[in-house]
Amino acid sequence: MPLTGVEPARMNRKKGDKGFESPRPYKLTHQVVCINNINFQRKSVVGFVELTIFPTVANLNRIKLNSKQCRIYRVRINDLEAAFIYNDPTLEVCHSESKQRNLNYFSNAYAAAVSAVDPDAGNGELCIKVPSELWKHVDELKVLKIHINFSLDQPKGGLHFVVPSVEGSMAERGAHVFSCGYQNSTRFWFPCVDSYSELCTWKLEFTVDAAMVAVSNGDLVETVYTHDMRKKTFHYMLTIPTAASNISLAIGPFEILVDPYMHEVTHFCLPQLLPLLKHTTSYLHEVFEFYEEILTCRYPYSCFKTVFIDEAYVEVAAYASMSIFSTNLLHSAMIIDETPLTRRCLAQSLAQQFFGCFISRMSWSDEWVLKGISGYIYGLWMKKTFGVNEYRHWIKEELDKIVAYELKTGGVLLHPIFGGGKEKDNPASHLHFSIKHPHTLSWEYYSMFQCKAHLVMRLIENRISMEFMLQVFNKLLSLASTASSQKFQSHMWSQMLVSTSGFLKSISNVSGKDIQPLIKQWVDQSGVVKFYGSFAFNRKRNVLELEIKQDYTSPGTQKYVGPLKVTVQELDGSFNHTLQIEENSLKHDIPCHSKSRRNKKKKIPLMNGEEVDMDLSAMDADSPLLWIRIDPDMSVLRKVEFEQADFMWQYQLRYERDVVAQQESILALEKFPTPASRLALTDILEQEQCFYRVRMSACFCLAKIANSMVSTWTGPPAMKSLFTRMFCCKSCPNIVKTNNFMSFQSYFLQKTMPVAMALLRDVHNLCPKEVLTFILDLIKYNDNRKNKFSDNYYRAEMIDALANSVTPAVSVNNEVRTLDNLNPDVRLILEEITRFLNMEKLLPSYRHTITVSCLRAIRVLQKNGHVPSDPALFKSYAEYGHFVDIRIAALEAVVDYTKVDRSYEELQWLLNMIQNDPVPYVRHKILNMLTKNPPFTKNMESPLCNEALVDQLWKLMNSGTSHDWRLRCGAVDLYFTLFGLSRPSCLPLPELGLVLNLKEKKAVLNPTIIPESVAGNQEAANNPSSHPQLVGFQNPFSSSQDEEEIDMDTVHDSQAFISHHLNMLERPSTPGLSKYRPASSRSALIPQHSAGCDSTPTTKPQWSLELARKGTGKEQAPLEMSMHPAASAPLSVFTKESTASKHSDHHHHHHHEHKKKKKKHKHKHKHKHKHDSKEKDKEPFTFSSPASGRSIRSPSLSD
């Protein structure tokens, strides 16, 4: 092999890429995707892709690409037929016959399977052999064009078809299809390099029915009709280098709206929704203006498209130059509650256009930078649009969320470093999944990861200032946009990738500040800080003695050393102090500025410069302190528990102007049920200039305090007189005024107060009759005729209020509840709910909010024993065809019923829906709800916990969810919640089995198979070079399928070694090719001259959970159909793994000669495998993963 070609390539790469070292031996520069047939009836897609690649090493003879679900018909490189192999170990993670049921084992195997096809490790499911005729061409590093014909039949992930079963043509029915998925999932719908770090330009062509519209990335160059005018082809060009993971598609009979403010923006929605689309998107141009202004940089693409579709995978999915939204975000001008939520979704998607789509990431460990920046600039937009109060409330909410999650699960690591120096190889050993790859992450963990990323960006901004922060973003964007315009210097494109080190370097260049300690604290390690604070005032020294303790031993916590701000409000004003938190300092002395109370009355200055009169009678006469706050700016990711007197919390609630401080004091006052607390809360409710969310929280706190003070409470029920004064008629206080929701603050308060009032209880722990009558009157006299806004959310809250008023039934002699002996109050509630439900059928409300509330209320009545507990109603509402919010509410009730009544039948019904429901989001939600409200947990004895359930869930996560990463990770979460990490307790002890130890090359007798053996297997996989004599027997998840040419003698020796040790053929039930085996054990026999024939096995098995029948003849039928009849010539072996193909040979009835040769395990191969043999290229070849036949309880080993 001449080395001359290699060196220049390597030098080039180093010089141009500035730190980005591609894991692939080639550079992709352009890709064509052409889908020329989409059949909505059959839910199938036919097309081809063409990838233009430049080899970067001379001896490139294998090209690995990503492809899942696609049936590959034919591969050509520069118009020469190329042989290929398809191997996807993620289809079935653990061997179907393995009796392993512990999650530790599964997580290791799953992480290995994912990295075996991870493009960022240079791997892929599809391995293409470069024809020998092109080897000289490759050595000269000349361009290769790879042409792949493929089809997709009823895809279960990646592309989602929505085909309503009504009359009419597909366009009239509103049938549409769109791409979807979690992280990099483009491989599910066309072959590509599915990595965020491999950028190229794109040409996208889609041929669809004339009534349909295809929306994709980039500029629509032209639309061409066929001669008969029945079909048309949309041609899109994306000239900005983009990763395949950011390519998307939506096809449907869309109505089109060009944005009236920005003509380069186009909006698409399903038929008849155009008026809603106009209103919903009318605001978008302001978001554009805001981002362009703060980033001082134009929007990077030449156009932007928003597509609103049904049955969305997530509410917002951002792709290069287009975003796909759920159609449920559309709303009219009459809707109040949805408006801010939809605007937030639009703003989020646009932030991700800059950071996430235009600027991509180098590797998974740099993901936090993109998620952090897009979340941070979205926060800035929120501050400008909804105001500082809303922004600070959001930051506090996000902080509470991440703190609660980290304390519960043990920490979220933003920048995982693997296998490097001091860092442990498993930085997240407390988790039940690997964090080395996005596809193994729990969905909840990933949401929290995004939340933490933007909070950390805010901490960086606190450290270097917002001005510098925005300069850094501008620098990243400018470099990227310069790079993106270099059409012929693709090595420059790596400037469009962001890495953690590059980002930090930018920060230090721009700001000159060293933020390394901050990064070390929050990015390179997981955990949050837990502070406990208390104080004493030393009158003699006029000093505040503050004691701050930390808990850094609990899971999810870390030790904090550094500055901490404390704000003290004294009589003479508000003072900030910065304490230095050291290793062991607990006590801090803070000098006070004011002497204790003066006699002369004077106004007290607040933090914001305002001066107010205060009634100081409640305070301690010896102390000038009004209230104290620790870390008021939330500049540490922390939880603070601070002790101060009740009057201090009351002053803080009344007079502190920061909404976060007010929220904190409301939370603290729950512990002080006194008349003074009651008064402070009532004052806040009456204050119109107080932030509406604080007033809403005060309602619920007041209800709790009233319940604690029930024996001493005087006057009408809490909040009733206030509500009457604010919202009822003067002349008739029990009749509510005609609705007028012009003031949104009072609208939210009017909606919330009755819900909080319904939580009031009298001395007998029942809801006071007066309150229930009051709520029923609100419903009865509700009048929305003169209101310009819809009252559907308000009415839904009234039903929630009715549900809140329900208390447990008192049963006499176990009487059965019937409608005749219902408690009269409950009868009234039930009548209202029934009336509302019937009204909904005639006049449905927006998003069916009322039906949702009714279903929840019925479940409350069931749980409290007023109506018979029966899931039938909920099951009927949960069926496919109802609006998604109704389905989720109904399913929530069924999940709850399953837990309370321990119903195996309902659990099975739910599991069946997880497998078979047409909507991916619903399947995901059911798993999520079962995890949050499980029928039992790992430490409980439960009749539901049995071997059949373990097997069922194991199969679900092992092979039943391979089409959707999110679903699989959800199944793993559920399995963990129910059974924990080790072997489920309800299983019998496994029989004695043999464990094959690949490291020692010997079998070990082992009663319970311990995860250590897994570690052994993994090392064997990751370091194949350490066992030259075991080349053929490699772990199916091997991540380093080495590229060097194979010495065939070694292969034959290893085959002899393995066949001698593992007598696989003698074993009748080798599961290598049962229908449920993943493609890792399927042979793809691809004859060279079979242009266009369907020669690859379909990689789309119909997963079902009734996997009782193991490999019977019928099961193999689909596989055999896919083999080619011409494949009876001797088969050449071409990768290390394929050498062990004989394990599954007895499943193929085509290659008899090959089988005869091996029948007695004599490896006397007559033909030579020479590097330049032309014969070799004419022969078909086979592939099968050697270890595919390996059960963890292996057959006997005999030497």
UniProtKB/Swiss-Prot annotation:
Domain of life: Eukaryota
Bias (Polar residues) ranges: 1093-1102, 1182-1199
Additional remarks: PubMed:9418870 was unable to show an association between TAF2 and TFIID.
Database matches in PANTHER family: TRANSCRIPTION INITIATION FACTOR TFIID, TRANSCRIPTION INITIATION FACTOR TFIID SUBUNIT 2
GO CC, one annotated term: nucleus
Sequence ranges of Basic residues compositional bias: 1144-1171
Disease: Neurodevelopmental disorder with feeding difficulties, thin corpus callosum, and foot deformity: An autosomal recessive disorder characterized by impaired intellectual development, microcephaly, delayed psychomotor development, pyramidal signs, thin corpus callosum, and foot deformity.
GO biological process: G2/M transition of mitotic cell cycle; mRNA transcription by RNA polymerase II; positive regulation of DNA-templated transcription; positive regulation of transcription initiation by RNA polymerase II; regulation of DNA repair; regulation of transcription by RNA polymerase II; RNA polymerase II preinitiation complex assembly; transcription initiation at RNA polymerase II promoter
Record-given protein name: Transcription initiation factor TFIID subunit 2
Keywords: Disease variant, Intellectual disability, Nucleus, Phosphoprotein, Transcription, Transcription regulation
A Pfam family recorded for this sequence: TAF2_3rd
Tissue: Expressed in all tissues tested.
Complex and partners: Component of the TFIID basal transcription factor complex, composed of TATA-box-binding protein TBP, and a number of TBP-associated factors (TAFs), including TAF1, TAF2, TAF3, TAF4, TAF5, TAF6, TAF7, TAF8, TAF9, TAF10, TAF11, TAF12 and TAF13. Interacts with TAF2C1. Component of the TFTC-HAT complex.
Ranges for region Disordered: 1-23, 1067-1102, 1136-1199
Originating organism: Homo sapiens
Compartments, as annotated in UniProt: Nucleus
Residue ranges of coiled coil: none
Function comment: The TFIID basal transcription factor complex plays a major role in the initiation of RNA polymerase II (Pol II)-dependent transcription. TFIID recognizes and binds promoters with or without a TATA box via its subunit TBP, a TATA-box-binding protein, and promotes assembly of the pre-initiation complex (PIC). The TFIID complex consists of TBP and TBP-associated factors (TAFs), including TAF1, TAF2, TAF3, TAF4, TAF5, TAF6, TAF7, TAF8, TAF9, TAF10, TAF11, TAF12 and TAF13. TAF2 forms a promoter DNA binding subcomplex of TFIID, together with TAF7 and TAF1.
Phosphoserine: residues bearing it: 1185, 1188, 1194, 1196, 1198
Tagged with keyword Transmembrane: no
Homology family: Belongs to the TAF2 family.
GO molecular function list: chromatin binding; RNA polymerase II general transcription initiation factor activity; transcription cis-regulatory region binding
InterPro entries in the record: Aminopeptidase_N-like_N_sf, ARM-type_fold, Peptidase_M4/M1_CTD_sf, TAF2
